[in-house]
Amino acid sequence: MPGYYLWTIGCQMNQAESDRLGRLFELWGYSLADKAEDAELVLVNSCVVREHAENKVVNRLHLLRSLKNENPKLKIALTGCLVGQDISLIKKKFPFVDYIFGPGSMPDWREIPEGFILPLRPPVSANVTIMQGCNNFCTYCVVPYRRGREKSRSIAEIGCEVAELVRRGSREVVLLGQNVDSYGHDLPEKPCLADLLSALHDITGLLRIRFLTSHPKDISQKLIDAMAHLPKVCRSLSLPVQSGDDTILASMRRGYTNQQYRELVERIKTAMPDISLQTDLIVGFPSENEEQFNQSYKLMADIGYDAIHVAAYSPRPQTVAAHDMADDVPVIEKKRRLKLIEDLQKETVGKANAALMDTFAEVLVEGLQKNKWQGRTLGGKLVFLESDLPLEGCLVKVKIFKTSPWSLQAKLVNIMES
């Protein structure tokens, strides 16, 4: 049986698409290989959100070109955001790649089976793409140019997929989109994310629902209320701010101010005092001075996030920022600001997790990791526990006995649902 190998970088949507493509290859008669050298087909699922990620993709492709020179029968497939909407440009740049198709698309060199392409034994926590694309065109972001405009799937279609995943063993779904808060705006009935959450909530056997990524300007009170009142919806929200300075936010074309963002957070915390918030932050955006960075730092400290995904700005081709704004913050200064935020996160999250010592939590166990069961709380905290019992897929009650900024150690109290 011929082998296939997947190399994936980037967001959870990329991982979800790679999982689906892997299942498709298996339907075509391939089996998963341990490494590229053992495969007849290698798929590269690419990301170009940051320059560092794009460089990794290009380096990987050149390594595969060398492998193909040694094994001319090897077929290389490329998808993801490196491809974008103009495949001809990629074909010219990487002529040794055999198959190229855009992000979110399916390969066209063989027949595609009808219906959902799902794993026979899906993970406990399964990714489900509910929409593609983005209409916001933030000045630094290449995603709208690569994945196109927003396109939502219907509630009925998503519901059928989730129900089938649950039937096959999943207990949680993570709803994915570049901007899930805009879900449904392009559909005839104009449903919203809150409507989708309500529909999925009724699926028997589904224990939890998560979603990402959100845009602060698009979060409605209806969504906040749905999260607060639907028990299966996790108390976890990704709320990317990108900057804490109003001038920089305007240059980014984010559509809100520091104060408006703070007011949104206050509304969310009022409705859900136990909410776990995560954010994305860019340091060193064009023209960002020390005072503007300090506004970001202060916002991070004031909100007290459970996770801060921070990155140094890098210009992306096609974007307004790359075309019209000078990348004028020195690299050494970007690195300094990056470290300050990382240190703040370690301190803030460390204190928040330490406050959980000797408390109880409900954990959905996802599987084994280094001989320990691994799962997450309703707020998304990573928890490890030891037990000889088969706990995969179980909802368990645990007691926290050790904490760190990155995870919690717990003891099993009892199994709540198996």
Swiss-Prot record:
Binds 2 [4Fe-4S] clusters. One cluster is coordinated with 3 cysteines and an exchangeable S-adenosyl-L-methionine. It comes from the Bacteria. Residues 120-351 form the Radical SAM core domain. Residues 346-414 form the TRAM domain. InterPro entries: Elp3/MiaA/NifB-like_rSAM (IPR006638), Methylthiotransferase (IPR005839), Methylthiotransferase_CS (IPR020612), Methylthiotransferase_N (IPR013848), Methylthiotransferase_N_sf (IPR038135), MiaB_methiolase (IPR006463), rSAM (IPR007197), rSAM_horseshoe (IPR023404). Its cofactor is [4Fe-4S] cluster. Its EC number is 2.8.4.3. CDD domains: Radical_SAM. PROSITE patterns: MTTASE_N, MTTASE_RADICAL, RADICAL_SAM, TRAM. [4Fe-4S] cluster 2 binds at residues 134, 138, 141. GO terms for cellular component: cytosol. Monomer. This is tRNA-2-methylthio-N(6)-dimethylallyladenosine synthase. The gene is miaB.
